[in-house]
């Protein structure tokens, strides 16, 4: 018995040591890391103070602050670029590369690549391969790393301000699940590379467009990403919790229906801030996010340069409106009441929570 216990303890110690020896990759870019760690961030009903402006400096934090950090890999080509048909990067949470994702740099002349759109708290295995014009394959690089962080920004070539709403803590004691619901700017100009990352790798096959006709061709009734995308346009105004109840309820019911079909959903307006931000606020609220985190998430869009601070004339009214309508109720219940009174069924809300809250 003693020997068995010692062996078990040794195994656990070796496993912990092995994990600690793996390269750690934070999925959050430096600006997001600093913003999320800022302990001076708090909530007040006036929403008159913000810290996000300290983290929008591109000279300090780099360009494209709405994009994630990732794992950088590099290699030395084995043949001339004219003889390379494709550079193929394979990523998996399994050492045998089962259930893998692929990435293909757009140029065969490159010697480096940034692997992004990672989930946090995972161990990933990767390999970079050179596929030659004669169909032979050469291994360029391989290894493993583990990820940390919370905010999962998504790189989609041809779009911006894309985020997975997962990872935020909730009043239910578990975080929101990653990989199901996404928010973004418009998807009209997504490139083939962006399509591969968003649709094929992330399974985003349902698109909800909140823009009005003046922001989009009136005749367009399908996704620009192709006919295989389940598409709907629900024209909604920003921040109108009372006037837009019917629109938001229609949107949530549609989203839940797509989740029931096993699809991941992206909703967007033009730049992914106002209409998109309002719907995100309402969904995240009923999933149990706190006042502070609802504000934090809204302000993340400022990292794209859109200056959507929580003191924005529209957003700053949202939380007080909720709390004033149900003054003797906790915040999560306020959002629940809002959706029920807007026409969403209890069964739909419970299904949303069952899918979107980590077990």
Task: Show the residue positions of the predicted features.
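Hydrophobic h-region of N-terminal signal peptides that target proteins for export
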Residues: 9-18
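Positively charged n-region of N-terminal signal peptides that target proteins for export
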Residues: 1-4
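Cys-dependent protein tyrosine phosphatase-like superfamily
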Residues: 18-266, 278-359
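A periodicity- and composition-biased signal for non-globular, repetitive helical segments
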Residues: 8-9, 281
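Ser/Thr-glycine-rich phosphate-binding loops at phosphate-binding pockets of nucleotides
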Residues: 271, 275-276
């Amino acid at each position: 018995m003693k020997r068995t216990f010692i062996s078990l303890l040794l195994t656990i110690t070796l496993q912990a040591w092995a994990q600690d020896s793996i390269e750690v990759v934070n999925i959050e870019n430096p600006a997001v890391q600093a913003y999320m760690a800022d302990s001076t961030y708090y909530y007040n009903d006036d929403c008159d103070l913000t810290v996000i402006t300290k983290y929008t400096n591109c000279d300090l934090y780099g360009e494209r602050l709405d994009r994630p950090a990732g794992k950088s890999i590099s290699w030395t080509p084995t043949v001339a670029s004219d003889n390379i048909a494709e550079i193929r990067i394979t990523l998996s949470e399994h050492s045998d590369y089962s259930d893998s994702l692929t990435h293909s740099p757009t140029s065969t002349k490159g010697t480096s690549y940034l692997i992004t759109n990672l989930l946090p708290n995972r161990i990933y295995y990767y390999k970079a391969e050179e596929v030659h014009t004669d169909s032979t394959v050469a291994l360029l690089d391989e290894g493993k790393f583990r990820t940390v962080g919370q905010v999962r920004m998504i790189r989609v070539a041809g779009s911006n301000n894309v985020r997975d709403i997962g990872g935020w803590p909730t009043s239910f004691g578990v975080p929101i699940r990653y990989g199901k619901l996404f928010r973004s700017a418009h998807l009209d100009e997504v490139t083939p590379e962006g399509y591969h990352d968003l649709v094929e790798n992330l399974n985003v096959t349902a698109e909800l467009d909140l823009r009005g006709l003046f922001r989009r061709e009136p005749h367009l009734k399908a996704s620009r990403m192709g006919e295989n995308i389940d598409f709907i346009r629900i024209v909604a105004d920003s921040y109108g919790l009372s006037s837009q109840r019917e629109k938001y309820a229609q949107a949530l019911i549609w989203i839940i229906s797509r989740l029931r079909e096993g699809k991941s959903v992206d909703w967007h307006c033009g730049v992914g801030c106002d209409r998109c931000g309002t719907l995100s606020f309402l969904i995240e609220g009923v999933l149990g996010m706190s006042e502070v985190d609802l504000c934090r998430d809204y302000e993340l869009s400022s990292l794209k340069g859109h200056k959507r601070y929580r003191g924005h004339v529209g957003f700053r009214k949202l939380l007080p409106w909720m709390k004033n309508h149900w003054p003797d109720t906790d915040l999560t219940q306020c959002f629940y009441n809002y959706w029920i009174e807007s026409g969403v069924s209890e069964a739909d809300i419970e299904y949303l929570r069952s899918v979107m809250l980590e077990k």
